[in-house]
Each structure stands twice: as C-alpha cells, then as structure tokens.
Amino acid sequence: MKSYLDLLTDVLENGSVKGDRTGTGTISVFGRQYRHDLSKGFPLLTTKKLHFKSIVNELIWFLSGDTNIKWLNENGVKIWNEWATEEGDLGPVYGKQWTAWPTKDGGTINQIDYVVNALKTNPNSRRILFHGWNVEYLPDEKVSPQENAENGKMALPPCHLLYQFYVVDNKLSAHLFIRSSDSFLGLPYNTASLACLTHMLAQQCDMGVGEIVISLSDVHIYSNHMEQVKTQISREPRKLPELKLLRKPESIYDYKFEDFELVGYDPHPHIAAPVSI
C-alpha cells in the first residue's frame, strides 16, 4: 500500500515535534486522509507482517459488546493487556458504546443494529453511522487507565471513533475518522479492521464492497519508532492479499475467525516496536 508509505513519509518530512500523554514524544502532522479500493485487494500491509488473527478477533470482540480482555487473551490477542485492571476490565470502551449506548431512561441503544437495518432498508441515507465518543465515560487524564476502569470510566478514549457508510451501485463503502493515529503500530490494524467490517456488513446486506476512506486528525510517529518507520519505508510493497468470507452467518454478531480466509499474503518480516502506554 503505497498510500500508507506516503503517509509515513509525510509525517517524517513535515511533522512537528510534540509532547504527548505517554511522555514518549512524537512527530506529528494534522489532518490527513487516505483511501483504498477494496476491489484491488485486502489492505493488510505487505511491508511488514501483521497478525491477522488479532485484527479479526479484536473486531469480533468489539461487536460482541465485551469490554473485558479475558476472551481476547483466550484467543491469542494481547494488545489490550497493558490498560486493563487485574480482573481484565477496560471500562465502557468501544464495544459497550457500539452495541449498548446507555440512554437517560436506563435503556441502551445498539448502534450496530441501527447501521445494519439502515443499510438494508434505506441505503441512500446520509445518517448511516455509529461512534464511540460518549463524553460521560471519557477517562480522567490525571489517573491511570486501570483507575479509570475501576471508576466506571473508559480505560482509554476511542481513537478510531466514527464510522459512516455509503452505498452506490449496491457497493458498500466506509469512512472512518480517527482522532489520534499511532501511524506505525495502530493505523495498519485500524485499516485492516475497517476493511473486515466493510466486507462483513456488505455480506450481511447482500452488497458488494466499494472503498474505505480514513480521515486522520493527529497523525504521529513516536520517537522510539523512527528507525522502524525508516525500515518499513525502504521496503517495496508486494501484491495485496484477498479476503474470502467462507460462510454467511445469521447476523453480524455471529462471525468467527475461521470464517475469514486470507489468500496470497506474502509480507516482509515483522518489525517490532514498543507500545507507549
């Protein structure tokens, strides 16, 4: 994906040095966008190997509404461990807001149900979206993620926070807004996850897939990722893999990792980098 490598180059060449919540330090640019036509392959990076199983299982976990890392750990996903309490709780993060947004009368709203129904019944609507930015549950930046979760707040606020969908010629496209993008570690996962979700929704609604568009606000590279980024930029992108969904589950909530087949993934080796907490 040359567009992703171009984005990394943009940050390296034009980024401003900034401090950040983690204390690591970054170089950052503000306001960028890139897109990918899903008919040209599945957007899983080939310039470094990514763990596809973690991407799919995290998305399945989000859609389940779960906010405890126990299921993730049991399914080989460790990417949330640093922020969870000893009991594995993360507070009302992504899945809670997606599937059970609290209402003032004590009920909940399932935004994913709304999206699926709207795609099936009113695909020309400009209101087909969901988001996770529930101000009432945003964390207190003065305390740790674990303390926030223990206090009923999110351990971390959503980075990938608003998803909107668009249908033309019976093909589904998706637009994601990311407020804060760790461009080396986080963005490749977000891109592939968005593509998976688009394929899943399209299948559930008997549509084809169009393109994904990602709008990024604060796009940064952490100071301890600079050499890794330069290594990645030096690599030549290879042909993208294809994604096949092997069955059509009864609902968007019933997918399993075994339903996803990645064909022709031939990436360069993995590039390790530390996570800033």
Swiss-Prot record:
(6R)-5,10-methylene-5,6,7,8-tetrahydrofolate binds at H51, D182, S276. One of its GO terms (biological process) is methylation. DUMP binds at R21, R126, R127, R179, S180, S181, D182, N190, H220, I221, Y222. The active site is at C159. Belongs to the thymidylate synthase family. Bacterial-type ThyA subfamily. Catalyzes the reductive methylation of 2'-deoxyuridine-5'-monophosphate (dUMP) to 2'-deoxythymidine-5'-monophosphate (dTMP) while utilizing 5,10-methylenetetrahydrofolate (mTHF) as the methyl donor and reductant in the reaction, yielding dihydrofolate (DHF) as a by-product. This enzymatic reaction provides an intracellular de novo source of dTMP, an essential precursor for DNA biosynthesis. This is Thymidylate synthase. One of its GO terms (cellular component) is cytosol. Pathway: Pyrimidine metabolism; dTTP biosynthesis. The keyword Methyltransferase applies. InterPro entries: Thymidate_synth/dCMP_Mease, Thymidate_synth/dCMP_Mease_dom, Thymidate_synth/dCMP_Mease_sf, Thymidylate_synthase. It is found in: Cytoplasm. It catalyses: dUMP + (6R)-5,10-methylene-5,6,7,8-tetrahydrofolate = 7,8-dihydrofolate + dTMP. HAMAP family: Thymidy_synth_bact. Its EC number is 2.1.1.45. GO terms for molecular function: thymidylate synthase activity. It comes from the Bacteria. It holds the Pfam family Thymidylat_synt. Homodimer. Keywords: Cytoplasm, Methyltransferase, Nucleotide biosynthesis, Transferase. Transmembrane segments: none annotated.
